[in-house]
């Protein structure tokens, strides 16, 4: 029997555009915050890394907290849309604050300014916005194919935005005056764009009635299912092995992204051309977008996500190994590096596209095994993964730069720094892809749900 469809094409496109807003925050922050803080503000990368790690201590708690709040929210706009709408206002303000650190402050005050703004952005505002945005996948449709399509549209916009930001930001900073003023102006422009697009995305979809989401008209049953505290919510998540797999995978992907963002340093100090970072961004994001276009069709053709995800990520792992080989050829064979980078990105695309549908399947697994509807809490893995993985990745890059004696005042870095940059940009991404492939080979949530339904 054909599944009921809930969405028009413009609903899916409107929803997907929300990740333009998400990435004018995340892509901008993850790609450029370290080089801004070290080369413009003059802060120590090791101390910055430590502050980011300290900030991450709050993130796990706030993810579950906001996920639980979303599950228990009842409003005319639904459960998730109010949090997505209002959370972004704080995102815009704190993003500008991070890239507007006064240069005339003492260094202690500058570190404190960064820590406060970064923590508020990640632990509070981005958490509320991103969990709500991700949870909409399960709240506006029950059709699994539409959930995959929503994920594909979302990440097509995400990677296109990331590509644009990585390609134009450094040039835009220079064009707008350079230095601290240039960074501040660019941040303001991105924040305004994000506010406008996020608002459009919120009002492009409508959440389904709660009774339809849980296949019951019994209001008391719905209310009973929502009666759990934060500790119980954490236990529900920890008890879902597929949630834990996705959460770890998400964290590893964000650490991967932080290592790839070291391309700004790699291009500048090893390849000798800062502009090559933008070229590598094209080699990553265009294949990802192409893969996302075909992901819904491939999922339908292969009757599920499992085989597609495992096979495509195996291709990505092999390709990243070849990127490393090409990178260690003398000063680096740029042509081969670009080729294998593109193939690796093509392999990573399907999982990006169907990840939200996999999380929805995880939520269904909890419903089938525990009879608890925890869609908002379940989608905490997206926010937790982005913040914890991205933050930890950025912290690690700061620590490794400091340990390798990076000096922003030098045009030629010491050999220890050059070696470390190669490890961060070439070796670690390959290792992370290999681990993700192994985890995906165990991600049989669709099969588990089918068995549970058959047993009812």
Regions found by a protein language model. Give the residues of each.
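Membrane-embedded alpha-helical bundles of multi-pass transporters/translocases
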Residues: 2-456
């Amino acid at each position: 029997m054909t599944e009921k469809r809930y969405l028009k094409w413009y609903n899916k496109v409107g929803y997907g555009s929300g990740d333009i807003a998400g990435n004018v925050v995340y892509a901008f922050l993850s790609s450029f915050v370290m080089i801004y803080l070290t080369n413009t503000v003059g802060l120590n990368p090791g101390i910055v890394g430590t502050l980011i790690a300290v900030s991450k201590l709050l993130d796990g708690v706030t993810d579950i907290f906001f996920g639980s709040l979303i599950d228990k929210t009842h409003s005319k706009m639904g459960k998730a849309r109010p949090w997505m709408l209002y959370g972004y206002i704080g995102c815009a303000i704190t993003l500008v604050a991070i890239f507007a650190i006064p240069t005339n402050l003492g260094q202690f005050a500058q570190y404190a300014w960064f820590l406060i703004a970064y923590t508020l952005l990640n632990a509070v505002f981005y958490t509320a916005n991103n969990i709500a945005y991700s949870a909409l996948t399960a709240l506006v449709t029950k059709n699994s194919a539409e959930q995959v399509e929503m994920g594909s549209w979302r990440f097509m916009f995400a990677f296109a935005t990331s590509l644009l930001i990585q390609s134009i930001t450094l040039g835009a900073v220079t064009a707008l005056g350079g230095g601290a003023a240039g960074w501040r102006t660019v941040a303001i422009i991105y924040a305004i764009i994000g506010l406008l697009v996020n608002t459009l995305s919120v009002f492009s979809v409508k959440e389904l009635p709660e009774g339809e989401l849980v296949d019951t008209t019994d209001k008391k049953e719905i209310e009973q299912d929502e009666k759990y505290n934060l500790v119980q919510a954490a236990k529900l998540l920890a008890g879902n092995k597929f949630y834990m797999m996705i959460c770890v995978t998400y964290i590893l992907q964000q650490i991967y992204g932080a290592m790839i963002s070291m391309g700004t340093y790699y291009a500048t100090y090893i390849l000798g051309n800062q502009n090559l970072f933008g070229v590598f961004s094209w080699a990553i994001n265009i294949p990802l977008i192409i893969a996302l276009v075909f992901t819904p069709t491939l999922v339908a053709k292969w009757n599920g996500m499992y085989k597609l995800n495992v096979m495509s990520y195996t291709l990505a792992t092999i390709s990243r190994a070849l990127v490393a080989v090409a990178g260690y050829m003398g000063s680096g064979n740029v042509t081969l590096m670009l080729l294998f980078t593109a193939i690796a990105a093509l392999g990573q695309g399907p999982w990006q596209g169907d990840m939200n549908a996999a999380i929805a399947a995880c939520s269904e697994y909890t419903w089938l095994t525990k009879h608890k509807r925890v869609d908002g809490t379940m989608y905490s893995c997206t926010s937790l993964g982005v913040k914890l993985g991205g933050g930890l990745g950025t912290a690690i890059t700061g620590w490794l730069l400091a340990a390798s004696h990076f000096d922003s005042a030098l045009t030629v870095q010491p050999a220890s720094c050059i070696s470390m940059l190669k490890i961060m940009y070439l070796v670690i991404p390959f290792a992370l892809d290999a681990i993700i492939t192994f985890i995906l080979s165990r991600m049989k949530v669709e099969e588990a749900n089918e068995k549970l339904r058959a047993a009812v």
